[in-house]
């Protein structure tokens, strides 16, 4: 499924052709299906095949029938578990509202009713910190212990920026879905815009494609 999704994004010109990961790659993951009770959750513990019961921090309560879990190690060395479940989603009340969305650089999104979602230009201080950390990393000898420590520092700053961006996009996409029955959004060729170096940073930062994806799957949920 992950490979199919990667090729789908590639053919839509949203990313490069998928490449198989080396074992040396700091990002590794695997998915295992639920079979005969091999996956279970009890409080702050999760039972996983071959690992048994281990402690984990839940971001939310897990409801529904477990289908599979994916274990992933991110660039900073942290491990995450994603749990796919089958559950019923309660439909939202009808609002009889239709809305159009324009996205841009000055403001992240402007609705046809005048509602504006500002582009917060996430974490300028973190960006400066990231640039400094990357400069230090470039001066380290690749593969050495000091290089690896600095690589982890860079990865953690990237994580903070990514997490904050995801939180923002989830917040506004959920708000729009809950308040409007029909939603229209312009079709943007982000990959073409990314060829313009002056726009690349801003577009990457506000993540229009990710926002559109969230709207699409949340609309299907409800």
What is the meaning of each model-derived region?
Residues 1-74:
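Acidic carboxylate diad motif detector
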């Amino acid at each position: 499924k992950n490979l199919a999704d990667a090729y789908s994004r590639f053919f839509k010109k949203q990313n490069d052709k998928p490449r198989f990961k080396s074992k040396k790659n700091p990002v590794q993951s695997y998915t295992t299906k639920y079979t005969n009770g091999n996956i279970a959750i009890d409080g702050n513990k999760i039972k996983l095949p071959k690992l048994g019961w281990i402690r984990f921090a839940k971001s939310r309560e897990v409801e529904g029938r477990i289908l599979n879990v994916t274990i992933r190690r991110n660039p900073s060395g942290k491990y995450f578990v994603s749990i796919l479940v089958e559950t019923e989603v309660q439909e939202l009340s009808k609002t009889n509202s239709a809305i159009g969305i324009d996205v841009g650089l000055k403001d992240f999104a402007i609705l046809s009713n005048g509602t504006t979602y500002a582009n917060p230009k996430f974490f300028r201080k973190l960006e400066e910190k990231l640039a400094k950390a990357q400069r230090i990393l470039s001066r380290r000898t690749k593969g050495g212990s000091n290089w690896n420590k600095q690589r982890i520092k860079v990865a953690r700053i990237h994580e903070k920026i990514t997490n904050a961006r995801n939180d923002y996009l989830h917040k506004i996409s959920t708000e729009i879905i809950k308040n409007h029955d029909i939603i229209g959004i312009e079709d943007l060729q982000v990959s073409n815009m990314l060829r313009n170096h002056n726009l690349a940073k801003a577009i990457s930062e506000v993540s229009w494609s990710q926002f559109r994806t969230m709207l699409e799957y949340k609309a299907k949920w409800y």
